[in-house]
Amino acid sequence: VAAVDVPVTLKMRLGWDDQMINAPELATRAVASGICMITVHGRTRCQFYKGAADWGRVRAVRDVIHVPLVVNGDIGCADTAGLALARSGADAVMIGRASYGAPWLPGLVAGTVPAGAMDIAANGLVSDHYEAMLSFYGAPLGLKQARKHLGWYLTTLECDPAPRLRTELMTATRPERVLELIGCIFSSQPLSRTIIGKDGKAIRHNDGLAA
């Protein structure tokens, strides 16, 4: 921590396994070394992503540190965020995998999405994100980086295109063709009609995708 002139934060799990829950001890040492914020995922290392995150066990970390505490794991809507905060005593939540293909989700959970922002068409949002990635990474790397996001969007927005269209979307090397496919595959309906409420769940749509 002393080697840099920027704030240093730490993310950890509850411990190695149920027999070694050492997050409180590690958090105490981290704060003593100068760590300014700690995030705890409510599973052990050995759980990977199996089972449910135990937000209540994060409270033991809250009891021993004074720096901001963030709780993470299985948080995907305002209700689960509220429960995680209540059970852990944390100051904030971190949304992870639930935001894959749903970049609007943190804003919905926090209640900070501007009025009208969800009126953008689903295919418009995906196109904007795709072009932003190409602009940031450049064409060769951006094309590859974008593919995982396109896959997540297909899942989150419950798009089920014909296999040949899905394959072409995930393998096309010309950005112009990818944008054409996005316009064809993803709904032209506003996100406010494509997803349901604060949970960010999708309504299945069929905009001529059987081709």
Where are these regions (language model features)?
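Glycine-rich, proline-tolerant flexible connector loops at the mouths of alpha/beta enzymes
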Residues: V40-K50
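Alpha/beta catalytic cores of nucleotide-metabolism and tRNA/nucleoside-modifying enzymes
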Residues: A3-D5, Q19-M37, Y49, G56, ...
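A cross-domain feature marking catalytic cores of carbohydrate-active enzymes
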Residues: L10-L14, G42, V71-G73, R97
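Conserved beta-alpha-beta core of the PfkB/ribokinase-like small-molecule kinase fold
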Residues: V1, L10-M12, T28
